[in-house]
Amino acid sequence: GPSLSLSGDVSSIDLSVLSGLSGMDMAGRLSGRFVVNGSREDPYGAADFTAQDGEIHGISFDRIEGHVSLGDQLATITSLHLEGPDGKHTVKGTVGLFAPHPLTLTIDTDKTRIEKLLALAGEDYPVTGWVENTMTVTGTMEAPQVKGDFLAFDGSVMGELFQSISGEYTYDGNDITLKNGLAYIYDGTAIVSGTVKPDMIDMDVSLNDISLSRMLPGRGADGKVNMRGHVSGTMEDPVFEGPISSRQISV
């Protein structure tokens, strides 16, 4: 193809003009400097950029700073920092320039809203709170594979407040698989591992010193219980099967 030899500066251009190119809704003002050589089929170069007061795929930002290099048909993100009202994100790694756009990314999130991350993934689970998260993203832009570890705090699951929840997870675009999950909830602790699908739960759980009055509000039950078993059903209507033990229960 024809050769490329481009360089220039941009100042406060509207990010929305890049929405079609990136495949994501974008807003804000972009400034930067770039150099691109090679060809359309094999470009190489680099860019430094900043963006202010905008949004990328539902994530609001006050400021973005980044450096990207082009080569070997990849965009290599050597540094990208996003700061906004919902937290801070740092991104490093590579994105393929051409379909299917292979991904190798590491994303560190410092105190952001769980609801925003779920919305970014196109999910709507009844979970709120703050989360610190480290994830790696592989696969392709059309079919990303995500794995990571997280610490969530000061939030709720299905309306029940929790102090903190931590664990390791994978996400394949449809199912979330959790390993070594530890939650401080219902005035006790919960250890969970398994899979959550949009229409089904398949998890092994161990609940220790759980408050019945917190877990079953309005049912007249009181006391502390230990439960070990399996949870099925859905997020809206979970079903627990397994033994229950307690030193004292009042109903």
Q: Residue ranges of each PLM-predicted region?
A:
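Interface amphipathic segments
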Residues: 1-251
